[in-house]
Amino acid sequence: MSLTSIPSLREQQHPLIRQLADCIEEVWHQHLDLSPYHLPAELGYVEGRLEGEKLTIENRCYQTPQFRKMHLELAKVGNMLDILHCVMFPRPEYDLPMFGCDLVGGRGQISAAIADLSPVHLDRTLPESYNSALTSLNTLNFSQPRELPEWGNIFSDFCIFVRPSSPEEEAMFLGRVREFLQVHCQGAIAASPVSAEQKQQILAGQHNYCSKQQQNDKTRRVLEKAFGVDWAENYMTTVLFDLPE
């Protein structure tokens, strides 16, 4: 079965979300040795109501020798809101950054597009191989850059956070995410396990990343309205940003 023949919420979403979801899975399958990562059955596909509109969430998760969890989430609220959320959680035995990407759109327009390879080093530095690969990428100029949230100090200097204002800018964003993913997959394949001491430092960095992401009030408010406070807390801490052991 080809990837594109699997029914998916993306077919009903903004074209950039569909293209990005396809791109992410294509690069993963091309470079990495994937196996399923099993979420609790009731959290793989979720339906609820938000302000009278149907809310649908579809989760796909994989794992590899280098990544404990690779999560692609698609969400749709009626015709008002389309969301893509993706994070690759490295195993702490490897010195790898956190790939994260989000698209938020509604009524035919993408309002927010963010992608980054975020450092887990507490001094906010990326591994040198990543630094050199990312520095060599072309500089992109978007007409509507956006400001990072207050908790956004977890992101790298290579982070893109924009409102794409044209099909050309959407294509630029898609191309840059593909480049980030290719750099990341190649970095992961080349990585060797680290010392026990380094593993503890990486764990601390991953904890910092996840705890900062859990502060995202917008995501939490949407989930609380649709499913209640307890469900939202459980989803934020077990599906979206679970902390490594």
UniProtKB/Swiss-Prot annotation:
Keywords: Oxidoreductase
GO molecular function, one term: phycocyanobilin:ferredoxin oxidoreductase activity
Outcome of mutating H71Q: Has 5% bilin reductase activity
Signal peptide location: none
Oxidoreductase listed as a keyword: yes
Any GO BP: phytochromobilin biosynthetic process
Keyword presence, Oxidoreductase: yes
Alphabetized InterPro entries for the sequence: Ferredoxin-dep_bilin_Rdtase, Ferredoxin_bilin_OxRdtase
The reaction(s) this protein catalyses: (2R,3Z)-phycocyanobilin + 4 oxidized [2Fe-2S]-[ferredoxin] = biliverdin IXalpha + 4 reduced [2Fe-2S]-[ferredoxin] + 4 H(+)
EC number of this enzyme: 1.3.7.5
Protein family (similarity comment): Belongs to the HY2 family.
Function: Catalyzes the four-electron reduction of biliverdin IX-alpha (2-electron reduction at both the A and D rings); the reaction proceeds via an isolatable 2-electron intermediate, 181,182-dihydrobiliverdin. Upon overexpression in E.coli with PCB:ferredoxin oxidoreductase, CpeS and either CpcB or PecB permits synthesis of phycocyanin-coupled CpcB or PecB.
Annotated HAMAP family: Ferredoxin_bilin_red
Name the UniProt record assigns to this protein: Phycocyanobilin:ferredoxin oxidoreductase
Encoding gene (name): pcyA
